[in-house]
Amino acid sequence: FFNVSIRNGVLYGYIIDVINRASELVILAIGMTLVTAASGGQDISVGAVMAVAAAVCCQILSGGQVSVNEYQNSIIIAVIAALLASALCGAFNGFLVARLNIQPMVATLILYTAGRGIAQLVTNGQITYIRVDSFKMAGGYIGKCPIPTPIFFAIITVLIVYLILKKTALGLYIESVGINGKAARLVGLNSTMIKFLTYVICGVLAGIAGIVASSRIYSADANNIG
């Protein structure tokens, strides 16, 4: 199981495959950790948000076509649009939980059930294929690097969130609100906004995971991504 070798210039082995396939889950788990730390709740809609982000990204890249061999629009615009869409999904969840005080499980159940339908509307109910080598790098390999690219995404996400939690005021605020939201509010912290931000961040991280997942399969499949 732990044997690792290099074949065709890339690392090969069961442990590498497990870590590679778990990369999207790590990114999702980091976002859900922030949500749990701040609100004590969960976000069960992250899989659907992944599908929405993948659908938006691939639909822009394909220009509305079912399958393309070259980009019809800028990949930068596509990625930004996908992350904005996922942030909007997170903001919707955050508004329901932080502002309307709906139980997180119930609030996020809305996008859990409706999110894939939204993704299907974006792609017109079809699987959108992006057969471009540069798009495949996010879910494959960059150049001659033997380590799968998703592993780098997961590591970078872990490091950034760790630094935010341990080295910034926002991290302290999230911890304070999570421990005792009422006490945090009484000392001047905007508990509502902090909870809201954690859901937005969770949505963005789900969007990143969705882009990586779509890159793996060169397409946006709203039924299976996430």
Q: What is the role of each PLM region?
A:
Residues 21-32, 52, 155, 159, ...:
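Hydrophobic alpha-helical segments embedded in the membrane of multi-pass proteins
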Residues 2-3, 12-64, 97-102:
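Single transmembrane alpha-helix segments in multi-pass membrane proteins
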Residues 56-59, 83-92, 113, 117-125:
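Mid-bilayer segments of alpha-helical transmembrane spans in multi-pass integral membrane proteins
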Residues 74-78, 88-93, 145-221:
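Helix-loop-helix "hairpin" substructures at the membrane interface of multi-pass membrane proteins
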